[in-house]
Amino acid sequence: MIQILELIKLLGLGIASAILFITIAMSDITKTKDFIKVIDEVKSEYPEGSLESKIPTSFIATIAAVETGNFNFKGADTANKANNFFGIHATGDQEFLPTSGGAKLRAFEDNKGSIRAFINLVKSDERYKDTIEAIDKGPQEMFKGMSVYAENPDYTSILDNVYRNRIQPIFQTENFLLPKRKPITEQMD
């Protein structure tokens, strides 16, 4: 009888652990999906066919996920307060918040401002020429041009890993689970 009670207790702990794990994982996925929606909103502000609208949403989401620690801003309170999802530093008279290390982290009114600034940086800064030239080859090729973005020599590998393991599966399952429906008038064609 004691063994059965012990098994029931362990089963209960296992189920509780599984529920907790799934809840945490779903929370991270929800943050990512919410940010992806905002990226798409910002990209829709640009003319169709423009360079800004061609930058893959998954590319932008991957950079933001890496720079924010999967949108949790753990240990990056200043970046969180500044709505800075890309670690962009202020120049000239741009609004900023000082970090504990003395850097001037650019401050944005909202996450859309941060996304616009990142798109503009990648589009206009000569250092990201290789990234822009790879735009038609997809995010993983674009990452190769981002080695100048961070001091970490493994930055492009980190981007590729986060893309393959976190961002790409969201896009794949979203398209799989929620197929686009044709209007009723076109369904019988």
Regions found by a protein language model. Give the residues of each.
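Catalytic cores of secreted/periplasmic lytic hydrolases that degrade extracellular macromolecules
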Residues: I15, F21-D189
